[in-house]
Every structure is written in structure tokens, then in C-alpha cells.
Amino acid sequence: MTLKACNLCPRRCNTDRSRAVGWCRMDDRIHVSSIVLHRGEEPPLSGTKGIVNLFFPSCNMQCIYCQNWEISRRGTQGIVMSLDEVCDAIADLLPLSENNLGFVSPTHFLLQMVSIVKELRSRGLSPTIVYNTNGYELPETIRSLEGIVDVWLPDFKYSDDALAESLSLAPDYSQYALRSVKEMMRQVGTTLHTDDRGIARRGIIIRHLVLPGFVDNSIGVLRLISENLSPNLHISLMSQYYPPDNPAFIYLKSKFSHDESQEGYPLLRVRNRTSDIEHGDSLYHTVTRKEYKAVIGSFYSLGFTQGWLQDPISHKNYRPDFSKDNPFGR
């Protein structure tokens, strides 16, 4: 794999990132948004001490509702750091953590990530490496990380590809998510291996964020995982969605036309490159208890028994501010 002709993700932009920026608007340097001790991940990742998370800027998806929109918008630069600077910052925080190191939105910085891991190992540091991805991955990219990544933490956002195109500019999302998670399973299996303190050291946790008004999409995701992957996987079923202060999100809202839907939601017509699709005005609200309960019901009926659920009011607790040294205020 190379950044001279970057094809790390399904965008396959083939850009020479030593001379120009790719679809993600990133070059070949190490750009960092934040390196922080984070206590808000799933219990086997955060434990009581927290996980050291390195947040990369930009993203190979562009979800209109992104909760981390301050750093995920294409072209958001973060801070350019040297390899030594990044590793020094990580090394300072690791003794305070559960010895877990998470890379958040790493796909477009995969080669830089590998360099960081190798440099840390050369210094005698061997944290558990957590690959925190949106799931829009090439299986061959995931395959290249065998022996580097210990715990895979993919999102599985969509079963509805029309929805994926309209909300995230990723019309073929579900096939790539399925294939990439299958490769993760080949590497580490379906069992989440933990140490004697319950801290994850090897395995997979799949995250799914329930979107208000799109329960069918969430149930479809669970069905895809159960039927095509395994119901034995650990699922983190999140209810923490909230309407972001993303200027693009607010602008888009002002451009929508409103009608009444069968469910009582006003409909919003979104025009994009390939299709027209109507969405409920529900994206401007949080997930209701009724919606989340319906998804939980499918979780159990499809055979899942392992994972984590959130309180439906969890959206009040997840409000990162990446203008601060610690975006999570802890």
C-alpha cells in the first residue's frame, strides 16, 4: 500500500498524496486533531482509567449528522505533527490509561498509523491497538493490518444503501462494511478476549448508532450482521444521537421541502448526485424510547446476547468540543 497512489478506502481516488490531497483532502503528513485520555468508550475499552485516543481529522465518509463534525469535515486540517511528537504525546498518556491506544477515523491515515505503532514498539511500548473505524473500508486494507491491530471497533451504520448515499455520500456502504468485518473476523474470531480486569485485548466490537426515524435501517443492520456475520459478535447499540450544530446540517435543513409522512414526520427531500430520497424530519430530534426499544427487541430476536445498550437519554452526555484540549471535558 502506498500514498503515492492512494487507494486505501472505497473512494479509490488514486491520488499521489505526496503532491496533492486525496478525496479526504489530506496529504501524506501526520495530521492530528486530538490525543486524549478518554473514559467514554465501552467498558472493556475504557475500564476505569480510560483509553488513549488519537483522533485524526477529516474522514472518508461525510455523514451530514456527524457527532464529531468539528474535526471530520473534509479538509479539516488538525495539527501537523512529527512521528516523534505524536509518539511522545502518546507515551506520556499511556501510563495513566488501561494500556489501550485507539486510532479514531484512521482509514485515510492508515500508513501513518502503522508508523506510529512501529515507533512505539521500538520504544518498548506495546499498548493494545484499537482500530475505531466508520466501517467504510476495503477488505484488503483491513487485511494489511493483521498483526498490527488487536481490537477492531467498526461502525456498521447502514443496511439501506440509498440512505447511506444520501446521508453519508457512501452508496455502496453495506457491502464494504460486511466484507471488511468478515476480514476482521478471519483475523481475531468472534470472541472478545479480555484480561483479568475485563479490559479488551483482542476481538471485535461492532457499533451501531440508531438514527431517529430510521428504525428499519437499524433492524436491517442487525439482520445483516446476524445472518451474514455472526450473532455471537459483541454489539454496542447506541442511542446517543443528537442533532449537531454542523453548519452544513443547518444549511441543508433550510433547503428541505416539507410534507407529511405516513408516520407523522414532515418529509425532507434531499437531492444528490444519483438519486432523490425523502427523509423524516426526525433527524432534528433525538431517538425516542419507542424507537430504541424496537431496535433492542430486534437485537434479542435475532439471537444477539452480547454487547452494550445505552440509556435513551445518553445523548445528553456525549457532546464533545474539539476546540478544547480535552474535547470530552474530563
Name each region found by the language model.
Residues 1-20, 191-330:
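Auxiliary Fe-S-binding modules of radical SAM enzymes
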Residues 1-60, 64, 68-75, 323:
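N-terminal [4Fe-4S]-dependent radical SAM core
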Residues 32-53, 88-105, 296, 307-309:
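Short Fe-S-cluster ligation motifs
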Residues 61, 83-92:
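Short, charged beta->alpha transition segments
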Residues 71-81, 100-105:
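Glycine-rich phosphate-binding "P-loop"
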Residues 76-78, 166-168, 283:
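Short, solvent-exposed loop/turn segments at secondary-structure boundaries
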Residues 88-249:
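Conserved AdoMet/S-adenosylmethionine-binding subsite of the radical SAM
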